[in-house]
Amino acid sequence: MKRNKLTVLIPPTPDNVNASEWWPVKSDVNWIETVYSDNKPAPSKLQGVDVFVGTDFTYEMAEFSDKLKAILIPAAGYERIIADALPNGTVVANASHHEAPIAEWVMMVAVALDHKLLQSHKTFITGLWDHWPGRYGPYRELFNRTFGIIGFGAIGRRVAKLAKAYDMEVIASGRSNNHSQIAQSLGVKYCWGKQGMKEVLSRSDFLLVATPLIPSTLNLIDEQALASMKKTSYLINPARGHIVNEYALYQALKEKKIAGAAIDTWYKYPTEETDQPRPSTYPFWELDNIIMTPHHSGATDGTRNRRAQTVAENIDRLTSGQPLINVIDF
């Protein structure tokens, strides 16, 4: 039986690339390209659309979604999809595939923090030998240290593999005991529940935040959690800014309650109205014990290609009546 051609709403493809090349579908689909503002199309553009490719969905968009079968997120996070706004029968699926570059970023900043790399570069290019051994140091090494991971999904597991390659002890925690077997296969001690998280916080030399932002993880790393960490430890967050309490983190770094941090995900982002905002209410940029990057740890060509492939596969699955992959259970 011949199926109707799907209408798919997408943002404009770059450099005049054909939509079917950017999103490599095998099916014959009707593409509608439109400019997104603050990650969203004009709500009226959803009218008559079967598939919406995007990261945000609002009540206003729902009002025009008369045919919407699926929202395909070309990213991992789904916190900007308002679940209560979804039309009946609309399926939401994401596309992660960013664990490899994020894990590389994590290990890069871990070494950089230990070796005071940014501070050393900043002073040395001005002609100062302030970080020369004998005048500063000694520096530290990853070997034989403890890497703690909060959240043992794809990113956490990838980081665990790399940390083990540095001969580090790796401990991880999650909300349930579901990951015990895979952790054991990777040589990782897995602790679950609140007690497990307490153990990871107190024992880690490096603490990776790798859990999704959902209601139960909002401000998960708060003042109490930061206070339970070693004063010599580092916090690394490529997940979502609001998992770590903004003020508590700033105070912990400013008062040297922890040794430092590397942060890739923030509390404020560019919008149509504010193109270059400061990423936080608090002046993290004035501190000397933080590495700040603009949410780019997973933004590689490989990630983009893998995500596009997953979105395309789900379009093909929807066309042929097969169940989608990576479906979000709200």
Regions found by a protein language model. Give the residues of each.
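N-terminal glycine-/charge-rich "phosphate-binding" loop or analogous flexible N-terminal tail
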Residues: M1-V51, I171
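Short glycine-/small-residue-rich Rossmann-like dinucleotide-binding loops
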Residues: F57, A76, T211-L213, A239-R240, ...
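Rossmann-like dinucleotide/phosphate-binding beta-alpha-beta segment
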Residues: Y136-K231
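Rossmann-like dinucleotide-binding domain for NAD(H)/NADP(H)
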Residues: T232, P238-F330
